[in-house]
Amino acid sequence: MASLQDIQRRISSTKKTRQITSAMQMVSTAKLSQIQRYGRGYQAYAARLEAVVEHLVAAHLFDNADAKHIPLIAQRPIRKTGILVVTSDRGLVGSYNANVIKQTNALMARLNLDTTNTAILAVGGNGADFYKKRGFEVILEHRGVSDVPSFNEIRSVVKTVTSLYESEVFDALHVVYNHFVNRLTSEYRDVQLLPLTGDTLVAMGGTEAHKAELDIQSAYEVEPDTTAVLNVVLPQFAQSLVYEAVLDAKTAEHAASSTAMKAATDNAKDLIGRLELQFNRARQAAITTEITEITGGMAALE
C-alpha cells in the first residue's frame, strides 16, 4: 500500500496537471470563439465567389472549347494523385489527427494509391511526419499555421499547389480535412479540387437541380473572352476552397483541443477525489494502528 507521503505527492502533481489542462481548455475555447467570428466574416466573400463560379458553370463556360485548355480545368490522364492533408502541428487534440489520417488511408485504398503514384502535400506537422515515415513523397510541407490563419498566409500554399499541378507533378488533387460541425463533433471531408469541374460545386454543397435552375447561358456576354475571365476567377476560386478547408480544419482543431482538455481536467478531478479518499483511509488506518499500539502498550504496563 502506498504511503501517505506518496499519496500526497500524487494529489499535488495531479492538481498541478488539472490547473494546466484547465488553462489550456480556456485558451482553446477562446481561440475557437475567435476563429468562428472570423470564419463567419469570410463566409460572405466565399459565398459570393462560389455564386459567381456557379453561374459560370450554369452558363456552360466550363464546356467552352477554349476553356478546356486552361490548366486548372484541363483533363489529362492521372498518373500521380496529389493529396493535400490538413492536420495539426501538435497533439492534445483527441482523435482529430488520427481520424484524418485513418480516412485518408481509406481514400488511398479506394483509389489504389501507394507510394509510387501519390504525392502528399501537408498542411500541419502530424500529417507530414506520418507519411514521411511510411515512405510517401511529401512535396509540400507547411507547418506553423496560425491559430486564426489569414488568407494571405494560405495563398502562398495554394500558389505552390497550383504551380505544381500546372507543371504536371501530379494530375489530380484531393483536399482532406476535418469539417467542424459543433464543439463536440467534426466529420472527415474529401474534396477533389483539381482539375476544377462543375462537379466540384456539387461536392461543396451545390446540387444538379440547383444548377439546372441557373441554366442562363443566354444571359451572359463574356468580355473580353471566356479564357480571360476564367483565368482570373478560377485561381481565386481554388484559393478560396483551400482557405475554407484550412479555416474549417483549424476550427475543428480548436474544438477538439477544448474537448480533450475538458476531458483531461474532468479526469484529473476524478483522480484527485479517489486519491483523497485513499489518503483519508490510509490516514485513518494509520491512526487506528497507532491507537491500538498505544492501548496495547498501556495494557502491558498494567
From Swiss-Prot:
Membrane topology (UniProt): Peripheral membrane protein
Biological process terms in GO annotation: proton motive force-driven plasma membrane ATP synthesis
Gene Ontology molecular function: any one: proton-transporting ATP synthase activity, rotational mechanism
InterPro entries per the UniProt record, alphabetical: ATP_synth_F1_ATPase_gsu, ATP_synth_F1_gsu
Keywords, alphabetical: ATP synthesis, Cell membrane, CF(1), Hydrogen ion transport, Ion transport, Membrane, Transport
Domain of life: Bacteria
Transmembrane intervals: none
Cellular compartment(s): Cell membrane
GO cellular component, one term: plasma membrane
Reported function: Produces ATP from ADP in the presence of a proton gradient across the membrane. The gamma chain is believed to be important in regulating ATPase activity and the flow of protons through the CF(0) complex.
Subunit structure: F-type ATPases have 2 components, CF(1) - the catalytic core - and CF(0) - the membrane proton channel. CF(1) has five subunits: alpha(3), beta(3), gamma(1), delta(1), epsilon(1). CF(0) has three main subunits: a, b and c.
PANTHER family cross-referenced by the UniProt entry: ATP SYNTHASE GAMMA CHAIN, ATP SYNTHASE SUBUNIT GAMMA, MITOCHONDRIAL
Entry similarity comment: Belongs to the ATPase gamma chain family.
Name of protein: ATP synthase gamma chain
